[in-house]
């Protein structure tokens, strides 16, 4: 069965995710409106700026549709996308997870680091990245950086504090497709 991956395209780094999936031969739909959710099988919520993203979700009146989709279908949130999926006032509250925004520093403090995932070294690009600070027992820690979780999964939801779409390595995107 052919999968169609939606990439939320109202703000942030959605194009790099779309390009990564296209390089894997996957059909991609840029999601901007409520009816766009009806034609996709899974969704990526990209990085960007979480407050702006939340404001736009409400302004475009797609917050509720996004919540319903993420409650049952595979979803991958990177950086700001992970924040939106976590616990917090005005967030989707779909993960047993609390985050600290910009915990790894400001834009000038961005960095690249090797992390281990499924017995493979991958590159993590951390740009104003959140830190996953309270992880519930329903959440599986898939990867860490300096003893802090940076890649997590809870049921149908995958989140990363880093940006795998900014590398040439499709490992994390392939994992998401297999969920």
UniProtKB/Swiss-Prot annotation:
Function (record text): Catalyzes the hydrolysis of glutamine to glutamate and ammonia as part of the biosynthesis of pyridoxal 5'-phosphate. The resulting ammonia molecule is channeled to the active site of PdxS.
EC identifiers of the protein: 4.3.3.6, 3.5.1.2
SUPFAM superfamilies: Class I glutamine amidotransferase-like
One GO term of the biological process aspect: glutamine catabolic process
Organism placement in taxonomy: Bacteria, Pseudomonadati, Pseudomonadota, Gammaproteobacteria, Thiotrichales
Entry annotation: catalytic residues: 79, 163, 165
Keyword Hydrolase appears in the UniProt entry: yes
Protein residues bound to L-glutamine: 48-50, 101, 127-128
Pathways involved: Cofactor biosynthesis; pyridoxal 5'-phosphate biosynthesis
Keywords: Glutamine amidotransferase, Hydrolase, Lyase, Pyridoxal phosphate
Name under which the protein is recorded: Pyridoxal 5'-phosphate synthase subunit PdxT
Natural source organism: Francisella tularensis subsp. novicida (strain U112)
């Amino acid at each position: 069965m052919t999968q169609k991956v939606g990439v939320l395209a109202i703000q942030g780094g959605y194009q790099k995710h779309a390009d990564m999936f296209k390089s894997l031969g996957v059909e991609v739909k840029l999601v901007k409106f409520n009816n766009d959710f009806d034609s996709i099988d899974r969704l990526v919520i990209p990085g960007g700026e979480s407050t702006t993203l939340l404001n736009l979700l409400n302004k475009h009146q797609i917050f509720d549709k996004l919540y319903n989709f993420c409650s049952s279908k595979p979803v991958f949130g990177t950086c700001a996308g992970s924040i939106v999926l976590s616990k917090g006032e005005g967030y989707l509250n779909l993960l047993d997870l609390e985050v600290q925004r910009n915990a790894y520093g400001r834009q000038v403090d961005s960095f690249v680091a090797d992390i281990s995932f499924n017995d493979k070294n991958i590159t993590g690009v951390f740009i104003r990245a959140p830190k996953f600070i309270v992880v519930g027992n329903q959440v599986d820690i898939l990867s860490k950086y300096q003893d802090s979780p940076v890649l997590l999964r809870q049921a149908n939801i995958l989140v990363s504090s880093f940006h795998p779409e900014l590398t040439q390595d499709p490992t994390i995107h392939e994992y998401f497709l297999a969920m």
